[in-house]
Amino acid sequence: MKLQNRIELLLMLREYLEENGEEWQMVKHTASIHNGWFTQEFIDLSVKNIIEEFLSQDKLTNWVNHYHLDDAIVPKNVGIVMAGNIPLVGFHDFLCVFISGHMQTIKLSSKDDILLKHLIKKMYSWEVTLQNYISFASILKGCDAYIATGSNNSARYFDYYFSKYPSIIRKNRTSVAILKGNETTDILEKLSDDIHAFFGLGCRNVTKIFVPQGYDFVLLLQSFNRYKYFADHHKYRNNYDYNLSIQIMNNRFYMTNETTLLVESDALFSPISQLNYSFYSEIDGLLSKLKHKKDIQCIAGIDVPFGKAQCPELVDYADGIDTMQFLLTL
């Protein structure tokens, strides 16, 4: 299949998503029932980002031109193990392999095995030969290369099975934010989006903030109030109640707006419903320290503006590993 045909199919997919017809709405509803974390709001947020950042004709064209893609590639079969922490989280890997001209065999997460499968089957209906390029499997074997995303534990498993092949293996990552103390209400509300979107389950969600000594948390806590409706989501509420009880039982100081906990901790990762914080005295030293932390996906307020952590562009490759360059060397 020629590059131009692949681009045209992606633009058809964009149109299908934008139309948001009854069929697609039903699929999204089914996905939200299958996984209680995949609310309609957050499925739509994922789709919006895909439409605007990944399937824009101009952005696709610039991306393709940057790598000088053409039809000369010798197709290899790339196995993709997808995560399932947020809706359509594996779309970018699918897109990279597809636009490169390679074939792919996808192992979907049981948490997110409805949305992407439907979209690819829809693409089959537009171009039947696509079935020769994209397939699904419950077990991956016999592929020429692998891209696998999972927890630190599953990464050891991936290393064992895939290390003898060309591979990208991704582990747990999270994101942090640095505040200077002079942020406006509008900026703090954007940071609140970076924290709360997808219930904080994404690797680009902010789970830890660094604030200057003497920081006043009142405005920050108030900015969280736009997500107070999380208290009505039973899975989130169960996590909040549990984490609150941990703080109380351990007699630890905490702050809360009754939906999100603020806890002083050195840990970068925080459990659902909790945001960790630490104080800093000198920002340059803090930045130098954070740049060497392999667990950090991005730093809101530094790498990306507040409110944009969940809006990665085509070239914002997970873990800083250029997926397209990897594929072009196969």
Feature locations, PLM:
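N-terminal Rossmann-like NAD(P)+-binding subdomain of aldehyde/semialdehyde dehydrogenases
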Residues: M1-G79, L275-L287, I296-A309
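Donor nucleotide-activated moiety binding/catalytic core segment of transferases
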Residues: H66-N85, A137-G142, N152-S154, T260-Q274
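Conserved small-residue-rich beta-alpha loop and adjacent elements
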Residues: W63-W126
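NAD(P)-dependent aldehyde/semialdehyde dehydrogenase
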Residues: F199-L330
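Short glycine-/acidic-enriched loop or helix-start segments at secondary-structure transitions
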Residues: G90-F91, L116, A155-Y160, L220
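Conserved NAD(P)+-binding/catalytic subdomain of aldehyde/semialdehyde dehydrogenases
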Residues: N77, E127-Y215, P271, A318-T329
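Short, acidic/turn-prone active-site loops that include or flank metal/cofactor-
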Residues: S109-D112, K171-S175, E313
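Glycine-rich nucleotide phosphate-binding loop and flanking beta-alpha elements
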Residues: T61, I86, N153-A155, F217
